[in-house]
UniProtKB/Swiss-Prot annotation:
Organism of derivation: Borago officinalis (Bourrache)
Reactions catalysed: an N-acyl-(4R)-4-hydroxysphinganine + 2 Fe(II)-[cytochrome b5] + O2 + 2 H(+) = a (4R,8E)-4-hydroxysphingenine ceramide + 2 Fe(III)-[cytochrome b5] + 2 H2O; an N-acyl-(4R)-4-hydroxysphinganine + 2 Fe(II)-[cytochrome b5] + O2 + 2 H(+) = a (4R,8Z)-4-hydroxysphing-8-enine ceramide + 2 Fe(III)-[cytochrome b5] + 2 H2O
Name of the molecule in the record: Delta(8)-fatty-acid desaturase
Listed SMART domains: Cyt-b5
Pfam families found in the cross-reference section: Cyt-b5, FA_desaturase
Length: 446
């Protein structure tokens, strides 16, 4: 009966936001997830970022209907006092329900078999070119094919991390490790750790790891005051070296993207051999060992060191296209400082994303991520459905006066460079005394 319900205020809920005492609210009911957070498949970071808050929209976005039954065991018996739902959230939940009833989350098409076949073809072509030809140009083409193989494998790894794209969870985990660890050398455990945090805290400067690139990049001037990364648990110091590198970031971004893959390799090893709890650590390490067995061996089959270096550079130059795409989706969008909030979750996703407009025949190249807002709103949606729901999302944003940015690949690059240039010029104009001799040498006048 209504009169027997127990209520707590929003202020009381907010007090339960520390490890060892974690409560969240979903559709007005309050749940104690203190112990569950240790078993949460998506890790502890997404829950901690929304601890002590209403997390309804985020829960709907990231969980299938079968997950709701798990909540009852976590129910505290309390309901949220004065629980209100904005019109934006009401419409979002209605959209999610309609898409679910239409079966869009289950209609996965033939993307997996097409992509796996394409990856196999690229890999076979690469190996054949390396082993069966003496031509430098064939070897460079082989490197490009391997780079495209890395891109397509990363897209499949991304898909498998968001939803079960295979016939079972066991096969899905195999696909994750195969495409992530074995084929690209990047741990799926590292990817899920950082990527889930990125989705929840999209474009939060101190909570979203995808924007924390000091000393190399700083998107807004907020980094110039030095921020504390809540994700990494350390200060992002804007020192003399950072000032120098950021001041030229609009010139260096594409070069950095070529070698950015090396950083991902390093991050993978740092996580897998850290003291942090890593799901399936042994399996991830085995997958990485597979990669670091076949990839160096393939490179060693080339006739000399000049060709080996050119092969790797060609390969990494192609994969740089994917790294660039990731920056286009977010760098020129709105940013903010502070934790994500569950009550305006949709608004933050819309403000922090940029779509890339392209013809449907190019969808394979972008892996569905050209529909960045659609993906952020419905991360469990198979990529083959994103183009279908795009007009509906556009109408939704128009109705609620929310931003819906869709730029061509060229225009998105221009917008990103302009954003980086603005921050670079601001970094040069800082009046603080340089602490880096390299900065002083490059900026000495007279």
């Amino acid at each position: 009966m209504e009169g027997t319900k127990k209520y707590i205020s929003v202020g009381e809920l907010e007090k339960h936001n520390q490890l060892g005492d974690v409560w969240i609210s979903i559709q007005g009911k309050v749940y104690n997830v203190t112990d569950w957070i240790k078993k949460h498949p998506g890790g502890d970071v997404p829950i901690m970022n929304l601890a002590g808050q209403d997390a309804t929209d985020a829960f709907i976005a990231y969980h299938p209907g079968t997950a709701w039954k798990n909540l009852e065991n976590l129910f505290t018996g309390y309901h949220l006092e004065d629980y209100l739902v904005s019109e934006i959230s009401k419409d979002y939940r209605k959209l999610a329900s309609e898409f679910s009833k239409a079966g869009l989350f289950e209609k996965k098409g033939h993307t997996v078999i097409y992509c796996l076949s394409f990856i196999a073809l690229l890999l076979c072509g690469c190996v054949y070119g390396v082993l069966c030809s003496n031509s430098l140009w064939v070897h460079m083409l082989s490197g490009a094919m391997l780079g495209m193989c890395f891109i397509q494998a990363a897209y499949l790894g991304h898909d498998s991390g968001h939803y079960t794209m295979m016939s079972s969870k066991g096969y899905n985990k195999f696909a994750q490790v195969l495409n992530g660890n074995c084929l690209t050398g990047i741990s799926i455990a590292w990817w899920k750790w950082t990527h889930n945090a990125h989705h929840i805290a999209c474009n939060s400067l101190d909570y979203d790891p995808d924007l924390q690139h000091l000393p190399v990049f700083a998107v807004p001037s907020s980094f110039f005051k030095s921020l504390t990364s809540r994700f990494y648990g350390r200060e992002l110091t804007f020192d003399g070296l950072s000032r120098f590198l950021v001041s030229y970031q609009h010139f260096t971004i594409y070069l950095v993207m070529i070698f950015g893959r090396i950083n991902l390799y390093v991050q993978t090893f740092l996580l897998l051999f850290s003291t942090r709890k890593v799901p399936d650590r042994a399996l991830n390490i085995i997958g990485i060992l597979v990669y670091w067995t076949w990839f160096p061996y393939l490179v060693s089959c080339l006739p000399n060191w000049n060709e080996r270096v050119l092969f790797v550079l060609t390969c990494f130059s192609v994969t740089a296209l994917q790294h660039i795409q990731f920056t286009l989706n977010h760098f020129a969008a709105d940013v903010y400082v502070g934790p994500p909030t569950g009550t305006n979750w949709f608004e933050k996703q819309a403000a922090g994303t940029i779509d890339i407009s392209c013809s449907s025949w190019m969808d394979w190249f972008f892996g569905g991520l050209q529909f960045q807002l659609e993906h952020h709103l419905f991360p469990r949606m198979p990529r083959c459905q994103l183009r279908n729901i795009s007009p509906i999302v556009q109408d939704y944003c128009k109705k609620h006066n929310l931003p819906y940015r869709s730029l061509s690949f060229f225009d998105a690059n221009v917008a990103t460079i302009k954003t980086l240039r603005t921050a670079a010029l601001q970094a040069r104009d800082l009046t603080v005394v340089p602490q880096n001799l390299l900065w002083e040498a490059f900026n000495t006048h007279g």
